[in-house]
């Protein structure tokens, strides 16, 4: 499940969906969904929640996976 944060105004118009950045608790590397992870063929605009279960931290390389990442209070928007 992808966690979205959407803000709507009283007139019914809504802002673009926003996606969280995640930080490795071991090395501090930040996964930015706007950039993806080219080292593992993860394209830009891939939300963290959609990364495969086999994905690993590109800095720790095999030492830690998704379970070692924590959500940050930093969000990015995807342009269509």
Swiss-Prot record:
Pfam family, one: Rubredoxin
TM spans (from-to): none
Alphabetical GO biological process terms: alkane catabolic process
Cofactor requirements of the protein: Fe(3+)
Species of provenance: Methanocaldococcus jannaschii (strain ATCC 43067 / DSM 2661 / JAL-1 / JCM 10045 / NBRC 100440)
Family annotation (SUPFAM superfamilies): Rubredoxin-like (SSF57802)
Taxonomy, superkingdom: Archaea
Protein's recorded name: Probable Rubredoxin-1
Keyword Membrane belongs to the record: no
Coiled coil in keyword set: no
Xref: InterPro entries: Rubredoxin-like_dom, Rubredoxin_dom, Rubredoxin_ET
Function text: Rubredoxin is a small nonheme, iron protein lacking acid-labile sulfide. Its single Fe, chelated to 4 Cys, functions as an electron acceptor and may also stabilize the conformation of the molecule.
Gene Ontology MF annotations: electron transfer activity; iron ion binding
Annotated residues for binding of Fe cation: 24, 27, 57, 60
Note accompanying the cofactor annotation: Binds 1 Fe(3+) ion per subunit.
Keywords annotated in UniProt: Electron transport, Iron, Metal-binding, Transport
Residue ranges of domain Rubredoxin-like in the record: 19-72
């Amino acid at each position: 499940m992808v966690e979205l944060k959407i803000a709507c105004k009283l007139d019914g118009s809504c802002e673009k969906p926003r996606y969280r950045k995640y930080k490795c608790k071991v090395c501090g590397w930040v996964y930015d969904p706007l950039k993806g992870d080219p080292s593992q063929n993860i394209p830009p605009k891939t939300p963290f929640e959609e990364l495969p279960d086999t994905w690993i931290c590109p800095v720790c390389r095999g030492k830690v996976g998704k379970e070692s990442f924590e959500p940050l209070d930093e969000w990015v928007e995807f342009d269509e």
